[in-house]
């Protein structure tokens, strides 16, 4: 089972490609404020670098938090859009063993249908001054 993994709650974002529990590729890059611009290219390059296309991917595992509001929002939006577009099962996990747990859940046939963020606290959104 070929699985794409996505983790974007930190300044350094991570994507991976797995065949079951076996890591085929894993990349970390300093995405910071360019995450929305870079994540799609990084995923496409990861797949192409291993002679894989979307027809080969059978599921998506993503880290749902806690972490950066914006980083989680971007990463989960990309994961959900890919899941919907390619009709792939998606699972989201939030503990230190997120990757192993997510892969096990996919292999067991689980599908969250929609990966939701877990921020760990209220989002700090600036209130209007008036």
Question: Where would I find each of the regions flagged by the language model?
Answer:
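DPxDG-like acidic metal-binding loop motif
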Residues: 59-64, 70-88
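A generic secondary-structure micro-motif detector
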Residues: 33, 68-69
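Short glycine-rich anion-binding loops that position phosphate/pyrophosphate groups of nucleotides
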Residues: 11, 65-66
């Amino acid at each position: 089972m070929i699985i794409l993994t996505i983790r974007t709650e930190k300044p350094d974002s991570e994507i991976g490609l797995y065949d079951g529990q076996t890591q085929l590729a894993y990349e970390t890059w300093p995405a910071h404020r360019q995450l929305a611009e870079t994540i799609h290219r990084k995923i496409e390059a990861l797949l192409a670098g291993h002679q894989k296309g979307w027809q080969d991917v059978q599921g998506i595992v993503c880290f749902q938090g806690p972490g950066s509001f914006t980083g989680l929002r971007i990463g989960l939006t990309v994961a959900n859009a890919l899941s919907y577009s390619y009709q792939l099962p998606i699972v989201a996990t939030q503990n230190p063993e997120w990757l192993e747990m997510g892969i096990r859940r996919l292999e067991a046939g689980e599908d969250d249908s929609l990966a939701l963020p877990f921020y760990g606290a209220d989002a700090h959104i600036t209130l209007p001054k008036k």
